[in-house]
Amino acid sequence: MVVEFKNEPGYDFSVQENVDMFKKALKDVEKELGQDIPLVINGEKIFKDDKIKSINPADTSQVIANASKATKQDVEDAFKAANEAYKSWKTWSANDRAELMLRVSAIIRRRKAEIAAIMVYEAGKPWDEAVGDAAEGIDFIEYYARSMMDLAQGKPVLDREGEHNKYFYKSIGTGVTIPPWNFPFAIMAGTTLAPVVAGNIVLLKPAEDTPYIAYKLMGILEEAGLPKGVVNFVPGDPKEIGDYLVDHKDTHFVTFTGSRATGTRIYERSAVVQEGQNFLKRVIAEMGGKDAIVVDENIDTDMAAEAIVTSAFGFSGQKCSACSRAIVHKDVYDEVLEKSIKLTKELTLGNTVDNTYMGPVINKKQFDKIKNYIEIGKEEGKLEQGGGTDDSKGYFVEPTIISGLKSKDRIMQEEIFGPVVGFVKVNDFDEAIEVANDTDYGLTGAVITNNREHWIKAVNEFDVGNLYLNRGCTSAVVGYHPFGGFKMSGTDAKTGSPDYLLHFLEQKVVSEMF
């Protein structure tokens, strides 16, 4: 009997026993770093001479892994293996597939500290964030397994005299998962195994910055007994194999999390019907945000400042849900800004192995991009806090606050994906909502208010997929906060929702006459 879903807990690091346990996990993981990792096609491990080097963004001298780089021929071999595996996998019952996924999640649960420790090194994640990432991966797998069980019998439709009708779901085929580096386990595992539990086959192309943690999932899937070829692991250069994966005539769906530029490219290319393709491809894309916290008048300014700072600087602002815009009523603007600066000064920045609040940004390209935006911010507004950068050993950017901005400034319009938040002053709540909606994105947002009428207005008019009252705009929880956004934030395919698996299923109707 499958027990009721409940979220996987993290570790309480105020308890010394948990601190000691996680330090041991970090030491154990460090001993294994630097190894070569293969492609995995039809269960076969294939080592290639050409490699992708994964490094610790907090200490660029430390190599995490050398991932074999797939070629187009490797991808072609993976599609052949996938199509063969599909013949058998699609015949498994929904319950059998779901039960196997529950076994996967049980293995991850036992290895949660190890999985989290890897992300501390490979993604520069702080301890709490890394553990939360691992726990969220478990949540996704557990939630989707139960969702598939719920969908197993289809949905009721009407019969009539002499006619019996059935409405049920069937799998689609082979697809491609392209996950991000910022949630290298949770999103990677969720977007890979959601289609799998629905009866499909996946080619997994991990993020170039975080292939090692994705390879660890492959080992767990093998241990759990997933048949060969159901998930094929093809790390590689997106310039070499990215379009090939998306364009392939056997790609039935693409799940992507990443930049707007790449997401729109995938969307466009997926619309083209290739020779030998007799179906329309599905794209499930999450492409980022320019998320805002709106602060009304007559509110708890301490709560507002805390919401802004934690949402802006958690994991160094490298969340698609991170607060990059603080839109504050003129009556409390100065006080909220001052308190936000004070809280920001208390944050620790450094190598996350040492359990700092903030760690590095992921790579040199992001470091340079964020550094450039800070300079733009200095021109458009006033640098209130932070702004410093240091790439002498790792890619470190201080938590940065820029005030005195206008809605059309680049700092307020363009996704930075780093620890930078801009403040803009507004005259009233109507203007605040106008400014909040004044971007191409619509992922998350939050409103700090004690005015119920204003909250109702925000619910109706704040154009985001996930809206929160009197809290920050990050930290969606599987089962409670199905996650996905509007406009250029993506296709609003709500992860962790009762509807998510429908993206990987076809609906079939069978009518039998008597």
From Swiss-Prot:
Q: Name one Pfam family in it.
A: Aldedh
Spell out the reaction equation it catalyses: L-glutamate 5-semialdehyde + NAD(+) + H2O = L-glutamate + NADH + 2 H(+)
Carries keyword NAD? Answer: yes
User: InterPro entries given for it?
Assistant: Ald_DH/histidinol_DH, Ald_DH_C, Ald_DH_CS_CYS, Ald_DH_CS_GLU, Ald_DH_N, Aldehyde_DH_dom, Proline_metab_enzyme, RocA
Q: Which GO terms describe its molecular function?
A: 1-pyrroline-5-carboxylate dehydrogenase activity
Pathway per its UniProt entry is: Amino-acid degradation; L-proline degradation into L-glutamate; L-glutamate from L-proline: step 2/2
Annotated EC: 1.2.1.88
According to the lineage, what is the superkingdom? Answer: Bacteria
Gene Ontology CC: cytoplasmic side of plasma membrane
Q: Output one GO BP term.
A: proline catabolic process to glutamate
Q: Which CDD domains match?
A: ALDH_PutA-P5CDH-RocA (cd07124)
Q: Which catalytic residues are annotated?
A: E286, C320
Keywords tagged on the record: NAD, Oxidoreductase
Gene3D superfamilies reported in the protein's UniProt record: Aldehyde Dehydrogenase, Chain A, domain 1, Aldehyde Dehydrogenase, Chain A, domain 2
* EC top class named in words: oxidoreductase
Task: Give the family this protein belongs to, as stated in its UniProt record.
Answer: Belongs to the aldehyde dehydrogenase family. RocA subfamily.
- Name of the protein: 1-pyrroline-5-carboxylate dehydrogenase
Q: Could you tell me which species this protein originates from?
A: Staphylococcus aureus (strain MSSA476)
